[in-house]
Amino acid sequence: MATPLGWSKAGSGSVCLAFDQLRDVIESQEELIHQLRNVMVLQDENFVSKEEFQAVEKKLVEEKAAHAKTKVLLAKEEEKLQFALGEVEVLSKQLEKEKLAFEKALSSVKSKVLQESSKKDQLITKCNEIESHIIKQEDILNGKENEIKELQQVISQQKQIFRNHMSDFRIQKQQESYMAQVLDQKHKKASGTRQAHSHQHPREK
């Protein structure tokens, strides 16, 4: 993620380093000013030449000017540092917000994955149940087909037996009819013979 206004972690580090260095310079300058003041006090106590006093005074003025310039630079660096810290805070909050959003999205994705996995498991279980039911039905159908085949064999055997019985019955009927015809012919022949004898007896008288 880019840092706004071109600031980076390395930039913030350099600002802090410059800030510390400026503080060291200011402390050194303040120490030097303190020493110069002590020298001036000693000069008041001990008479010195005008040239030496002017040189010391000039040096003191230069140090004060440098000190003031350093303070201005320090103030600018402090302003930059505060601005950088503010940006870091904003970025930290934004990062935390994005982190929470990411964790929420990740949690949602995980939840959906678990739901889909659960649905998948349920579908697999349902398919297994259906497959098991189909296998059972096929076993039942195979059993029924075997029963039907056995019944067909029994029926075929019964039909054959029936046909055999019918054939025997027809033969018996034919035999009975033949016997009846023979008996009828014999009966007719016997009747004819009796009638012939009955016609012959009166003539003999």
Swiss-Prot record:
SUBUNIT field: Homodimer. Interacts with CBX3, CBX5, GMNN, GTF2B, TBPL1 and the polycomb proteins PHCF2, RNF2 and SCMH1 but not with CBX1 or PCGF2.
Molecular function GO labels: DNA binding
Region (Disordered): 180-205
Gene from which the chain derives: SPATA24
Disulfide bonds: none
Protein name from the UniProt record: Spermatogenesis-associated protein 24
Biased composition (Basic residues): 186-205
Region feature (Required for interaction with CBX5 and TBPL1): 138-185
Function: Binds DNA with high affinity but does not bind to TATA boxes. Synergises with GMNN and TBP in activation of TATA box-containing promoters and with GMNN and TBPL1 in activation of the NF1 TATA-less promoter. May play a role in cytoplasm movement and removal during spermiogenesis.
